[in-house]
Amino acid sequence: MDFFNLLEAAFLGLIEGLTEFIPVSSTGHLLLIGHFLGFESTGKTFEVLIQLGAILAILSVYSAKLARIATDFPRDARTRRFVLGVLVAFLPAAVIGALAHGFIKGVLFETPMLVCIMLIVGGFILLWVDQLNLRPRYHNVMDYPLPICLAIGFIQCLAMIPGVSRSGSTIVGSLLLGADKRSAAEFSFFLAMPTMAGAFAYDLFKSRNILSFNDGALIVVGFIMAFISGVFVVRHLLDYVSRHGFALFGWWRLIVGSAGMAALIIWG
């Protein structure tokens, strides 16, 4: 392990935290970076634990809201309906993700060109949705009806294709189903908690026999960077999309997807 390895670990942790909660596909970015940089020194352990850093980032930022939800849950029907809605939205990904885990990790995650195509397609979709003259019916995540939550949950399953983006699919789905931009992003945050935690736990279980902490310093650096950058994004994203929408992320996807595709064609 040398300074370059530490720098690379910090960079990957930064990318995980910055891209996990915005609609640009953290998995797509990490797969492309891994393909072109060949970062394999920490393997599965590094991949799993930097994701934990992002999970803890959103839990820390939303700790006060989560505590309030827990306090209100026994006596407030609206809060109970909201929690049920998040769980209902989580179920499709939990079931389909468990059933298709081998195919997703073994086939889809080994196809960098697919990542680039999905980044580009998703970029065009974000730009299109951002320009639509939508009239939102839901301005607060607490008011999402259960059928809407279930529909968002099925739409989230599209993000099992690397490059689609979990947050991107849920945000676009929420917007098209009647949510305003701020609540769409916030519901994506709440849905991220069980979805990411479930994916983390499942990956940890499936990889339990190959996990290694030999490169502990790299794991710690990546974890810390994912946590810090994740906290920054979660704190500022809602205000940003309320004022500016999602066009920036659409262009971001188009640029990264096109650059990745060109690099794959030229260098493979």
From Swiss-Prot:
It is an enzyme of class 3 (hydrolase). One of its GO terms (biological process) is peptidoglycan biosynthetic process. InterPro entries: UppP. Its main location: membrane. The keyword Hydrolase applies. Pfam families: BacA (PF02673). Catalyzes the dephosphorylation of undecaprenyl diphosphate (UPP). Confers resistance to bacitracin. Bacitracin is thought to be involved in the inhibition of peptidoglycan synthesis by sequestering undecaprenyl diphosphate, thereby reducing the pool of lipid carrier available. This is Undecaprenyl-diphosphatase. It comes from Brucella canis (strain ATCC 23365 / NCTC 10854 / RM-666).
